[in-house]
């Protein structure tokens, strides 16, 4: 499940990057 959390964070980072 830890990987799932990491993946979610990765998506969030990607979203932030796209929004930048």
Swiss-Prot record:
Keywords, in A-Z order: Cell membrane, G-protein coupled receptor, Membrane, Receptor, Transducer
Q: Give its localization.
A: Cell membrane
Major location, coarse class? membrane
What this protein is called in its record is: Octopamine receptor
Q: How does it sit in the membrane?
A: Multi-pass membrane protein
One cellular component (GO) term of this entry: plasma membrane
Query: What is the protein's known function?
Result: Putative receptor for octopamine. Octopamine (OA) is a neurotransmitter, neurohormone, and neuromodulator in invertebrates. The activity of this receptor is mediated by G proteins which activate adenylyl cyclase.
Family label: Belongs to the G-protein coupled receptor 1 family.
Q: Which GO terms describe its molecular function?
A: G protein-coupled receptor activity
Keyword Membrane tagged: yes
């Amino acid at each position: 499940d830890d990987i799932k959390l990491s993946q979610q964070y990765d998506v969030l980072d990607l979203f932030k990057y796209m929004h930048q």
